[in-house]
Amino acid sequence: SKTQESISNIFNGTIKNCEDLLPDLKVFISELPKDIDLKIKTTTNFISLLKEKSCTDSKEYEMLVDTLIKFDKTTATIIAKAELLIVKKRYNEAISSLNSAKAMTKDAVQLEDIDFQILEVQFHNLNNYQTAYRLALGISGSNKNKALQIAAKCVANSANSCGSSTFDRKCNYYYAAELAERAGDSGAASRYRSNAPNAEDKFNNNNELPI
């Protein structure tokens, strides 16, 4: 069939990039196998291929992911959907999908990884530093140090908006440095300390204190 011919071309390396792949993919989507297991396997293979060819921002990729979820709704497929939504800058929808994925698994490591993905969206994409900071402190396991690095960045990025005086605002960098040290990032800790109050700041602040 034409679908099988397209599949053969793709997996034999005839199709080299996203532009070559998508026209054949439209044929594939319209002629998916009727057998559910084969449908799932073939769709999964094409999702992997589109990732490899950097086609994840195409509407065809979203159609494939939605097709896979329809027939094989698992934690992995929901995460794939969330990653697609991140690419499309639909960040709140992505977080919703990741929370749905959390509800479908009891695997501790997978839960930690999903929590870290949510943290990254909150920090890198939405710039929600308060939310990201709170999430970061709750993350354990293999992602703990990376989460603490993000927590330190949240404190540093929010430093100028937290405190009633310049001295108080600069003091936030002490805490950012502490978090960075806990994360094992001594370089970042040193940079944060360089923004903390210096000897002159401390002297001037003491002079302002009530006698």
Where are these regions (language model features)?
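Structural register within alpha-helical repeat arrays
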Residues: 42-50, 64, 81, 101, ...
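Terminal, low-structured helical/coil segments at or just beyond the last alpha-helical repeat
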Residues: 182-211
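Short coil/turn linking the two alpha-helices of tandem helical-hairpin repeats
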Residues: 51-54, 87, 119-126, 152, ...
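C-terminal soluble interaction/assembly domains
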Residues: 133-138, 143-164, 170-185
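Long, well-ordered mid-to-C-terminal structural blocks that present hydrophobic/aromatic surfaces
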Residues: 65-141
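Generic helix N-cap/helix-start motif at coil->alpha-helix transitions
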Residues: 2-10, 18-22, 33-47, 57-61, ...
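Alpha-helical repeat scaffolds
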Residues: 1-2, 7-9, 20-31, 57-68, ...
